[in-house]
Amino acid sequence: MIQKEGCFVMKIQAVLIDGFKNLSNVKISFDNITALVALNNFGKSNVLAGIDFGLTFIKAKMEDKPDMMSNSNLIPINCFMFGRNYKFEMEVLTELASKEYRVLYGYEFAWKCDENAKPQIVSEYLRIKLEDKGQKYTQLINRNVQRALYKSSETGRCSSKINVESTELVVNKLRAYDELFYAEIIKKLNSMRFYME
């Protein structure tokens, strides 16, 4: 959750992590109090480190991202998971223009598993919906290996092309687009902090 002058700005509802150390498709839903309980060496610390890594990667400078994507201490070495991409997804609640929205943001990148491999972001998406019953998600970012698209106006589609480097996130590039109707959400995603006790 991000706090700003005593009011809640963004609250994490759920996180999904895959392809980080020994973690495979771990999804955690958060309540007001959430506890991770397991025997020693079952990956509790890896879950917390995976969340921290996912948020740190979003905020990292573009020149630091390739090093993060090449960190051999974080690449899965389990024989069933070796070479698996890192995937991070978070679901958050936030306010925009006095309305509550559910935001789904995620990305996936290929680790640099050997000297010949090139780390690259292979997928990224941002979807929002009003937190009312029966509402559907609206796609704001849609990226794959071939192209990156974003929604440039409230009435249009997610079809505007944007040029990004292979290790650059669209959500980082869109910080410079102040005229977007969802610019506040982009700024919040780029400045998230995660506190654990």
Model-assigned labels for residue ranges:
Residues 40:
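The conserved Walker
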Residues 102-197:
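Electropositive, glycine-dotted interaction segments
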Residues 49-115:
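Conserved P-loop NTP-binding catalytic core
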Residues 14, 32, 50, 123-125, ...:
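Extracellular/lumenal ectodomain signal focusing on beta-strand-rich modules
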Residues 44:
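Conserved lysine of the Walker
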Residues 25-31:
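Phosphate-binding P-loop
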Residues 36:
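Hydrophobic anchor at the beta1->P-loop junction of P-loop NTPases
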Residues 2-24:
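N-terminal pre-Walker A segment at the start of P-loop NTPase domains
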